[in-house]
Amino acid sequence: MTQPLKDILVLDFSTLLPGPMATLMLSEAGAEVIKFERPETGEDARLTEPTIDGESIGFAVLNHGKRSVALDLKSGEAMDILRPLLEKADVLVEQFRPGVMDRLGLGYEAVRAINPGIIYCSITGYGQTGPKAMAAGHDLNYVGDSGILSLSRGPDERPTMPFGLVADIGGGTYPAVVNILLALIARQQGGQGTHLDIAMSEGAFAFAYWAHAEGVIAGREIENGGARLTGGQARYRLYTAADGRQIAVGAIEEKFWQAFCDVIDLPPDLRDDQRDPDTCAAEVARRLASQPSAYWAPLLAAADCCCTVLKTPREAAVDPHFTARGVFERKLDISGRIVPALPLPIAPDFRAPAGQTGRAASLGEDNPRYGAKPPKPR
């Protein structure tokens, strides 16, 4: 099947996250992505550890398959290089604070005057307008402001650090990609270009839809970690086995809960986790702690009760299930070493053949293609 974005040109002015992951997804679906970077050092991710022979692994994971142009956006030559590209580009992605692109002469109105069909995607923490539009922040701030971080629970009954970049990726990358694709369809149907205002803090709200229903609409006070999906019930929480490994018990439905209780031989009088949830959870914890995870894993798998032993990222990468589905079969070349590429949620039919090996362009590698001066050697 032909890659659906094979004729789409994307100009990428973003750094770190979430923009680079969004443009990576577009690239994987066939779009040509030109990444613009500072001439001196490139974007910040090029400087992050770990590295392979000086090449940042994190940068390569998020930026392979893109062209690199090192360009000082404040220089006199910048618009000479950019204007021909702006005239034919389909999508522009940026994640500066509001007003920065305007000062560079690259704001939406200026670009739209050059190309009325441009789909201009701005990704920020709090959006282009509002009292906090200019506020600095990172993922931790955005999930904190959205209310979802308050729903986690740690050993001291306080919110814990999130395990992943929920706002950056879930509130920034994914909404950006979805809305860019919607805008492309709308334009194809006779519409014009548009300015997409993606706010990571707003995109995070959907991750706790149930808290919106219970807390905002129903007006209930949701205690920290006290809801069904945040550890408030014995049948949906993490427990520790005798070897210290964690077991994820997700037996929400009654049939799964009873199957799990049978595995650990929980007495019938304790199986009603609604009546005395603390006592029930304590006994479940005691029983799971009596044996190592290797003992429980096959029993829980055989019972098919939504209970699994937590894996590390390295264990997950060699899991037979993911191997069978080819999740990690795409490869990257990082300074001559072939490594697994980051799995992305794009159907295989829409991507290039898995046998191709991706590579991140060196800083300014594509400057000659677009008439830009080569960057000075670092």
Please report, for each region that a protein language model flagged, where it lies by residue.
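Short, surface-exposed loop/helix-turn segments at secondary-structure junctions
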Residues: 46-50, 215-226, 319-333
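Short Gly/Pro-enriched turn/cap motifs at secondary-structure boundaries
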Residues: 59, 225-231, 237-238, 336-343, ...
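Short acidic-hydrophobic surface loop/beta-edge motif
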Residues: 60-62, 237-242, 328-334
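Oxidoreductase and adenylate-handling cofactor-binding alpha/beta cores
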Residues: 146, 172-193, 206, 210-218, ...
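A short glycine-threonine-serine/GTX helix/turn-capping micro-motif
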Residues: 160-171, 193-195, 226-227, 234-236, ...
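Aromatic-enriched alpha-helical interface/lid elements that frame and gate functional surfaces
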Residues: 230, 234-303, 307, 314
